[in-house]
Amino acid sequence: FYAFSGHKIYAAPGTGVLYGKRKWLDAMPPYMGGGEMIATVRFSGTTYAPIPEKFEAGTQNIAGIPTFVPAIRMAENMRSPEIVSYADDVKKFLYERLSEDDRITIYGRPDNLDLKIPLFSVSVRKAHHEDLAMVLDKMGIAVRSGQMCAEPMMDRFGVTGMLRMSLAPYNTMEEAEYFVQSLDKAIKMVSQ
């Protein structure tokens, strides 16, 4: 199986793709019921619609689905050499600045920064990730805070959660610098 979430490329939440071999999809029972997924219902049993309908209970995401194709096109356009080069420069700048701060632990340090996706998961000594996220939000910066659906990983690193920042291809060097300055201010505010 392959699964892909549309919101990872800026499509609306609840969009995506599930790809599986027909023999497995045919053999799998639906995990929900309702809507057009049922062909017939009798006291003797239920016959499900063919795939993919048998897995599509209820009303489809009619507001989100139209965002999926434009998001794919935008993602394709973001692969131009100029955009990739600039985004890599922003990523490297942010990584270097975060690495210089001895209060910050970066998880997943890469051997080759060129291969690293533009996402940084960090913890900050004497500052709770949720407090930092709240202060950064007040500064106009969106980050993710918590266990990132990966509680065993948090246990492995001995933390209750992390702060995660993700860069987009349209983020600027100025925004990365603003983030570094704002994170420094937030750390000072919540660690006192």
Predicted regions and their residues:
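Pyridoxal 5′-phosphate
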Residues: F1-Q192
